[in-house]
């Protein structure tokens, strides 16, 4: 099975440090690497996806939400944000705009490096 590279943003890394133990984090990264289209696309974000991930016995429904971007074959998966469902359910409009801006910069960087 094809495995994609997963790049963590500094924000994701800080959030993941608080939400996952080492094994859970490795499991999440491996899952994303194997299933880059696993989550649902968030409208208005330029292709950002949201995936549920169970952590520390919380299960998928009550677990963690992982926000990430996959731009296609040959492009890394960018882990952008992670948060507990108890902290928030969805991204607010300003967060959506912020991730859309970040994704636009990632896409531009990708075009410039080709």
Task: Identify the residue ranges that each predicted region occupies.
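Arg/Lys-rich, positively charged N-terminal/basic patches that mediate binding to nucleic acids
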Residues: 1-23
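Generic secondary-structure microfeatures
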Residues: 16, 24, 32-36, 52-55, ...
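Basic/aromatic recognition patch in beta-strand/loop cores that engages polyanionic ligands
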Residues: 39-83, 87
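Sequence/structural signature of beta-propeller domains
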Residues: 2, 22-29, 34, 47, ...
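Charged, alpha-helix-enriched surfaces in structured cytosolic catalytic cores
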Residues: 4-7, 23, 62, 94, ...
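Enriched for short, Lys/Arg-rich terminal
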Residues: 70-114
């Amino acid at each position: 099975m094809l495995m994609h590279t997963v790049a963590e943003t500094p924000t994701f890394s800080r959030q993941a440090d608080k939400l996952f133990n080492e094994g859970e984090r490795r499991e999440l990264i491996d899952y994303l690497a194997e299933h880059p289209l696993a989550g649902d696309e968030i409208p208005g974000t330029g292709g950002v996806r949201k995936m549920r991930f169970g952590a520390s016995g919380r299960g998928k429904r009550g677990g963690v939400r992982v926000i990430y971007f996959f731009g296609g074959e040959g492009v890394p998966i960018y882990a952008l944000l992670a948060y507990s469902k108890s902290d928030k359910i969805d991204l607010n409009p300003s967060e959506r705009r912020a991730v859309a801006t970040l994704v636009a910069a990632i896409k531009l960087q990708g075009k410039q490096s080709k």
